């Protein structure tokens, strides 16, 4: 029996059916991106910039572009996918890698809703996937700090939907529908003291209290811990996590229901490794729980 999958299934069922909502935090403040921030975690480089409003634009592929699948060589099985090259225009955000810490600012690429992301360290050069499978795909790209926190300016997030070989209608963000993007945690994370960064991006609706028109609430559940509801997009530090695998679910809700759309609900897992991970900064306290 796959325990992780079973746990995820239970978490999704709990979140979708709904628990009582308790809103936490004030209305989100419209603040500028901090300039040259110090890393909140030892072992990671400090941030640089930005030098102005961060803007990111996907130049290729074009929206709704149909990328042909190359024919297979004679005697070989049919080709199942095609190379896809990404090109972007990025302004006012420096990408770099620090030699001492082997960390730095870069872009992250997310294809559809898979669990892994792909770091893009030099946005002046194209990024090519050797083969994406046939069908419709949505790629999301955004800049991150060395410690994994995303830049949250609206113009710093870019999304494009295209097709490889055929249009199957899957992995499509409907126009105007909210889009939830999980930045962290993903994969393996250091957690000697049990503190792990939870960071997300949301487009298509403001994350705020229900009194704000067209707003959404951000709800997450980790393992068997009480569900948490947030009304702002500040990063959250998950505390007291033991080494090993943890399952979690994050969703965008209105009136205690998941909002419609292909990218409004995410279920995944991450692994906390043994090793030092310093305490999170005091400015980012853990969110309050909503109860069992």
Put a short name on every predicted segment.
Residues 13-26:
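Bacterial N-terminal signal peptides
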Residues 72, 80-86, 192-198:
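Structural beta-strand segments of beta-rich domains
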Residues 89-99, 201-210:
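Short amphipathic, basic-aromatic surface patches that mediate peripheral association
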Residues 115-123, 226-233:
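Short beta-strand segments within Ig-like beta-sandwich modules, predominantly Fibronectin type-III
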Residues 144-152, 228, 254-261:
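Short acidic/polar inter-strand loop motif in beta-rich domains
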